[in-house]
Amino acid sequence: MTETVYDVVSIGNALVDVLAKVGDTFLSERQLKKGNMTLVEAAEAGKIYADVIPERQVSGGSAANTVAGLASLGADCAFIGKVHDDELGQLFQRDIGAAGIDFFTAPLTEGPATGRSVVLVTPDAERSMFTYLGAARKLTEDDIDEKIIRDSKIIFIEGYLWDEATEHQAIIKACELAHKYNREVAFTVSDISCVNKHREKMLELIQEHVNILFANEEEIKALFETDNFEEALEGIKPMVNIAAVTRDSRGSVIVHGREKIFVEAEQIEDIVDTTGAGDLYAAGFLYGLTHGRSLGTCATIGGITAAEVLTHYGARPEVSLRGLVRHKLMAYGKRP
């Protein structure tokens, strides 16, 4: 195996998140679906945006959030995704560069604007996302840089990349290159709406290409069309090397061959916003995995990094995750 430059390269939608606090009536009056990611066109996104008072406007996107978390932990990372060379696209490029992440994908100079996600957070801290993908949809296999794939230990792909045939082709090219260079492919299901729309394609991708799977309990059950959690775990077991399944306040379950590892969740006094919790769990887990930690410790790190993002608005960490994880692991009697 050749030497690597990056611990992880992630591939996903490059978006800017607009975060706003709303009441449940805001959603019900507009017949907006709570708790999921809903794709909208530019006009609808603009209409929702006009009706809220934004708390923050920050770079986002699931896979981009994950590498931002990894970079905060001290990992070497790259990102592949598409923006337009407009104001929001330049904001995204500045933010990801400031985080220490290599981002070489050429921006669009014409066509759709940079994608944005209006993230509405209700008093129960649940996030409802209304996403205009815009330029993000224009990712093609030409954007998949063979050298970056070759130079990365793990290729991390988000489940939101399904709505355009060209995006799917890009995913397959990345997976095939990963196998060519004996790299591992990690995949996050991302959202139950993605599962319900693309179940068969997802299962095919997982079966043929994925080594490491991330999902939450509801997503894994939806993937196998069952209400039985244990049945879903049995379904995924022969398909991947590692499955990391989160269960909110009940922690996470790691499935590896015949082994099941149960890890408790971090205790959080006040959950402010659930946006990005799954993204940051994946960041912590992958950091542990690329740095030789046991699967149990990987899950513990994932729990720590997910917990940090639950305590504030936005999906990017607000403290040094490296220092936080070191402190927490020492407190738990684990090697920092």
Where in this protein do the model-derived segments appear?
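Glycine-rich phosphate/adenosyl-contacting loop at the front of the ribokinase-like
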Residues: 1-80, 90-91, 98
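Conserved phosphate-binding/catalytic region of the ribokinase-like
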Residues: 1-9, 14-15, 28-36, 176-177, ...
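Alpha-helix C-terminal capping segments
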Residues: 67-76, 120-122, 288-291
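Hydrophobic beta-strand scaffold residues
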Residues: 77, 103, 185-186, 243
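A glycine-rich helix N-cap at a beta->alpha junction
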Residues: 95-112
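Conserved phosphate-binding/catalytic loop of the ribokinase/pfkB sugar-kinase fold
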Residues: 104-108, 119-164
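Conserved beta-alpha-beta core of the PfkB/ribokinase-like small-molecule kinase fold
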Residues: 154-234, 250-252
